[in-house]
């Protein structure tokens, strides 16, 4: 299949924003993947690379990124948050934008399968910090981004296609938030590519359309970037996410 879009990077990251001089707010960036629920054939000793390549809880549970960016397996809470984005292919609302929803994976019983006429895309989340209203990568986040780049440089991710989807909270105008989310996704994408990522990466901004906490639009958890691992339906998924800010 010939893809008629440019490739860029994809992974999930939670981003913390600084509001003023002293208070820090977190923004999450996620790395989603297609919900095939089939582990990759390749093996790797890089546990973060394995998590990003599969998006499965069994591979992502208990992963911890310590202060210097080292990846560790632990028995405590994971630094990876899993979400699923659901794209409705039978949307008959008559609007130009597709119907895309998001749900947090709670770690309970696995879904029996996606509904007919929809595409499910999984994501994995990692905390990355940005200053308030900024898309510039902070110096204190470079080590962590370097570790993520190494995971994308692993052979298990070589040649795979990922979309990086940037999100904002519900504050500000739709137009501004769409632009800011796109810039943050592009910043992370560039950093991963410079760090040696072997995957094809596509940055996309969706602004405030897909709030993680819709009941609290200003919640810092809504400010995130999602990384989606794409397969045969890549063009459909990318076009659906791009249309949310068109």
What is the predicted role of each segment?
Residues 125, 159, 222:
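Short coil/loop residues immediately preceding or within conserved phosphate-binding loops
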Residues 167-245:
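Periplasmic OmpA-like peptidoglycan-binding domain that tethers envelope proteins to the cell wall
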Residues 130-165, 189-200, 227, 235-241:
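Periplasmic peptidoglycan-binding/anchoring modules of Gram-negative envelope and division proteins
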Residues 2-10, 16-119, 246:
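N-terminal targeting leaders that direct proteins to extracytoplasmic destinations
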Residues 105-110, 115-151, 168-174, 245:
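Short, solvent-exposed beta-strand/turn patches at coil↔beta or beta↔helix junctions
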Residues 41, 78, 134-142, 178-181, ...:
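Solvent-exposed, acidic/flexible segments
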């Amino acid at each position: 299949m010939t893809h008629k879009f440019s490739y860029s990077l994809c992974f999930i990251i939670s981003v913390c924003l600084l509001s003023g001089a002293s208070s820090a707010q977190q923004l999450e960036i996620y790395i989603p993947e297609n919900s095939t629920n089939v582990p990759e054939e390749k093996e790797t000793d890089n546990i973060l690379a394995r998590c990003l390549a599969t998006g499965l809880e069994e591979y992502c549970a208990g992963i911890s990124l310590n202060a210097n960016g080292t990846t560790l397996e632990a028995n405590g809470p994971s630094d990876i948050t899993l979400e699923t984005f659901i794209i409705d292919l039978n949307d008959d609302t008559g609007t130009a934008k597709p119907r895309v929803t998001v749900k947090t994976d709670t770690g309970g019983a696995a879904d029996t399968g996606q509904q007919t006429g929809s595409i499910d895309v999984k994501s994995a989340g990692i905390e990355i910090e940005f200053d308030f209203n900024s898309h510039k990568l902070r110096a204190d986040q470079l080590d962590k981004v370097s570790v993520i780049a190494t995971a994308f440089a692993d052979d298990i991710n070589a040649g795979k296609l990922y979309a990086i989807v940037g999100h904002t909270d519900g504050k500000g105008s739709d137009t501004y938030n769409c632009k800011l989310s796109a810039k943050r996704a592009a910043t992370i994408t560039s950093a991963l590519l410079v760090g040696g990522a072997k995957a094809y990466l596509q940055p996309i901004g969706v602004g405030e359309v897909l709030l993680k906490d819709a009941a609290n639009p200003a919640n810092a958890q809504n400010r995130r970037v999602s990384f989606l691992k794409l397969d045969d339906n890549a063009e459909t998924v990318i076009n659906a996410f791009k249309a949310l800010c068109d």
